[in-house]
Structure formats: C-alpha cells, structure tokens
C-alpha cells in the first residue's frame, strides 16, 4: 500500500516529468538524493560532493537536493519511493537489494568474504561489479556506482571476544537473510530494525548490540550506549548509488554525460575518504572512553572464521553459487 508521503512526492515527480518534456522551460532538473546516514559519514560526504559536481558539470541544468538522516524516507521505504519516482537517487546499503528480489547482492554480506579493501575493489570496480549492477535494470533501477563505507565491528554491553560470547544476545541487523544466518551461526538472536531506530533500541535495551563500520557507530553516537566493541572486520558495509531507470533514460544525453562524470569523480572521492573516516571515528570513540575496544588476536579471528565461513555454503542457493564463485575468483586475481 502506498504511503501518503510517497503519493505526495509522486505529484512532484509527475510535474518533473512534464517539465522534462517541455524543452523551452529553463527550470533546472531536480534530483532528490535521499539517504539514511549523517552528512559527515563517507556516504554523506560523497552525496555532498556529487551535488557540487553534478551542478558544475551540467552547467546548472541539474539541481541536486540531498536529504540525509532519513529526512524523506526510512531505509525500508526508500527503494519503493525510488521505483515509484518519488525520489530520483539513493545510495542504499547493498543488503537492501536482497529483499527487493536481487539476491545476488547479498554476496557482499557474507562474513569474511573480503580480506581487505584491495580484494573488495577488484569486485566493485571490476566486471563482477558491473554484472551485479546490471541485474537491477529489471527492477526499474539503474546502478551507477559502488561506494564504500567500511568493514564492520561488533558491539554490545558485554565483551565479544569469542563466538560463544554472542549466545542469546539480541543483535540488530539490516533486513538480510545472510546477516540473519551470520547471527544465528554465532548463537545470537537477530533483530531486524531500521537504522534510525537503533540508538534508542540500544539505549533502552530492546536490543543488546549491533554491527556497524566505526563511522556509522560514531556519527550515530552508539558508543554512548555500548560498553564493549570488537574490531572484528568480519563483514563489509557498502552502498550502490542508484537512480530511477525511467528518469535516467529520459534525461537529455548531455545532462546524463555530465552526471556520469560527476558520479565517477564523486565515487573516487567517497571511496578515497572511507577508510580514513572509519579510522578517525574508531580513534575518536577510543578517546571518548565510553566503549572498551578489543582487537581480535590471530587465534580469536580463526575461531570467528571457523564459525562464520560456513554461512557461504548455507547461502549459496539463495545468492547463487555462480555469483559467489565469480566474486571469490575476482578477489583472487
């Protein structure tokens, strides 16, 4: 059922469509770029950079309006809004495409599938990444780029050193069957919850812990309500920058070319700062002193991997064995 907000936004989208069909109008083409995180995260800064460059490279023909912190839609609502044309651009986390029916993207959620950023970028910046983005076309979505956030850490109010430490803990996750399997493998109880609701849920004890890259944990002040965190780097959180396909295909060719250039440069910028931003956030949380951080030893990491890597085979039928194989082959190149 359509929400009132989406229906209201559709009125504006219809007006935009009419404006595009009348070349004589000098009004700029408006691109509403919605996302759910803070402006000072890697994604938030990437969106701001795209806003700047898009207007520059289209000579003012495009006006990008960035809406951070779920100002327009929560993360569960965003994709529907995009498909209906209520917003034109999003950068949802890659876990969001599984529930949409493009389960290949859940390969990014598999624990310990990427050793480091170098291995990751062989996928997101290579042929495997292009193949994955192309699968969105059938859903009325055009994929433009992959943006990094970073590798995730685990947090809770009790130490998380070994897999047994998760037994019975209620852990917040995004809506993802892979992340459910990950938490189940650890003996935790996965709790699907919108990102905007996590701080309060941690504060009130609705959930015991969660997983996030440091930048997300820090900018949402989750370290204020989590006593312990483990730098596990067990999983990756990234985004796909996407647009409504009908909107994109209807843009004048020169405008689309300018936007593609802006996106390419914004992607280099966003990915270039992601690792640095996470390192800064981690250090800032350590300095704040409200959370005790633990670095896994080699022995502890091996124990985590032993418990979590069987999730790869468990999810092969859902994600696609060929997709998993293609990603692993790309990382090994």
From Swiss-Prot:
Signal peptide bounds: 1-26
Metal-binding keyword on record: no
Chief location of this protein within or outside the cell: periplasm
Gene Ontology CC annotation, any one: outer membrane-bounded periplasmic space
Matching Pfam families: DctP (PF03480)
Intracellular or extracellular location(s): Periplasm
Family the entry assigns: Belongs to the bacterial solute-binding protein 7 family.
Subunit structure: The complex comprises the extracytoplasmic solute receptor protein DctP, and the two transmembrane proteins DctQ and DctM.
Name this polypeptide is given: C4-dicarboxylate-binding periplasmic protein DctP
Organism in which the protein naturally occurs: Rhodobacter capsulatus
Record lineage: Bacteria, Pseudomonadati, Pseudomonadota, Alphaproteobacteria, Rhodobacterales
């Amino acid at each position: 059922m359509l929400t009132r907000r989406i229906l209201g936004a559709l009125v504006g989208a219809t007006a935009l469509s009419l404006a595009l069909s009348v070349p004589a109008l000098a009004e700029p083409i408006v691109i509403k770029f919605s996302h759910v995180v803070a402006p000072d995260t890697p994604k938030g800064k990437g969106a701001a950079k795209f806003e700047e460059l898009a207007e520059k490279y289209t000579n003012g023909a495009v006006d990008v309006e960035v809406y951070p912190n779920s100002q327009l839609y929560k993360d569960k609502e965003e994709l529907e809004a995009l498909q209906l044309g209520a917003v034109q651009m999003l950068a949802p986390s890659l876990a969001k495409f599984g529930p949409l029916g493009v389960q290949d993207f859940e390969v990014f959620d598999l624990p310990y599938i990427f050793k480091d950023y170098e291995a990751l970028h062989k996928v997101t910046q290579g042929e495997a990444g292009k193949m994955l983005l192309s699968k969105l076309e059938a859903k009325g979505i055009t994929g433009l780029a992959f943006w990094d956030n970073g590798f995730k850490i685990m947090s809770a109010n009790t130490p998380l050193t070994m897999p047994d430490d998760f037994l019975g803990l209620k852990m917040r996750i995004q809506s993802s069957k892979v992340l459910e399997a990950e938490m189940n493998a650890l003996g935790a109880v996965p709790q699907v919850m919108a990102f905007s609701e996590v701080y309060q849920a941690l504060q009130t004890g609705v959930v015991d812990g969660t997983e996030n890259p440091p930048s997300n944990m820090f900018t949402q002040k989750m370290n204020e309500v989590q006593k312990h965190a483990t730098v596990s780097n067990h999983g990756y959180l990234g985004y796909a920058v996407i647009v409504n396909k009908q909107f994109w295909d209807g843009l004048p060719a020169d405008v689309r070319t300018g936007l593609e250039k802006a996106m390419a440069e914004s992607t280099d910028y966003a990915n270039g700062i992601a690792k640095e931003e996470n390192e800064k956030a981690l250090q800032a949380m350590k300095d704040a002193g409200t959370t005790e951080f633990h670095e896994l030893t080699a022995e502890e990491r091996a124990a985590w991997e032993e418990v979590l890597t069987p999730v790869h085979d468990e999810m092969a039928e859902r994600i696609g064995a060929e997709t998993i194989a293609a990603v692993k082959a790309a990382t090994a190149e």
